[in-house]
Amino acid sequence: MSRSTLAITSLILALSVPAVNAQVSEGEYIATLGDCVACHTSNSEQPLAGGMAFPTPVGDVYSTNISPDKTHGIGNYTLEDFIKAMRDGVAKEGHNLYPAMPYTSYAKMRDEDLEALYRYLMDEVEPQAVANRPTDIIWPLSMRWPLAVWKWFYHDDSQFEPDSKQSDEWNRGAYLVQGAGHCGTCHTPRGFAMQELALDGTNDKYLKGAELDGWYAGDIRGDLYSQEEMVALLKTGRSDKEAVLGPMADVITHSSQHFREDDLNSIVTYVRSLSTTPVSAPTQLAQASESAKTDYKMYCGTCHGSDGVGRDHIIPALAGNSTVLADNPASLVNILLHGGQTATTKAHIGYNMPAYDWKFNDQQAADLLNYIRASWGNQGAPVSAQNVKAQR
């Protein structure tokens, strides 16, 4: 090889390196958008090695090893294999994946984003020699061929199509919410076959709220929150009135706090644009009892205040709180019984809400929650002892 040829070759290689590194960096960001680590990491010392349990009506399924390990992970996947898994829900070995893996959302992702994600997983993630855990689903329910039928009815593998009538910001938000962010996985109600009843905003059931694993992922359509408040919740897990606990706190810890500012604003712009119906007042209102008032003063008032206003950006207010007033009280009951932790972010350390399942029986817990739902201007529907019992 001549010196001139060598020099030209070296220059070409040097110029190509930033492009490759930029793609890998973008791939890591896409992994953050998709919150891959939250579902595919059950042991923090073995990131992306799988093993996280996902309850289903027929038994638990477990997330798989998506590290580049060639024996247990995806180290032998080609880019085409990877895209087929992400978009069609089919593993390299040919079996159908359970839709606990939200390929119904990932199908909307662009090829270039899937390729960047693939390059990140293959080139920057450490291989983890951890075997995949088999499902707890018993035969014959464990046969996977019915999943092909399920997909025939409920899976749309088409990519996201921008709406020319909307702004670039709106379209970016729609792409992230419907695709990598897979927000509908938790926030969209499901049908009898556990399918999401809508996959985009053209259907008013999309993001309308759903109960999942004992938590209620609320209706996030429309302008319940201001642009600034919703961005703050996604970035810090807190606003001047509310704090996020439960599964969404994990999403904020691992994922949304790291989103670029313009992406956060795009997401909120899209979600706030979705039409919603005004929430009507409950036909029956919760009632506050004297015994529950005493319990509140003893166990809740020190932090949340006798007036229910909490402490700004530290302890959430109970007055006017959307979780407190939700028609579905699942999250509220869950927090009282089992406690919870807020998101840990760059701006705030997480703090714990203590569990009170040891202190209150079902009726006492219901009475306390009814006191909260009926005080300081709150007008919530009553919580029953049966609601509490279902969450123990």
Stretches with model-predicted labels:
Residues 186-236, 253, 322-359, 368:
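Structured core of small recognition/catalytic domains
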Residues 1-23, 45, 61-64, 85, ...:
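Post-cleavage N-terminal segment of exported redox proteins
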Residues 32-41, 64, 81-87, 99, ...:
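C-type cytochrome heme c attachment motif
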Residues 37, 73, 125-126, 182:
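Primarily extracytoplasmic ectodomains and periplasmic/lumenal surface modules that are beta-strand-rich
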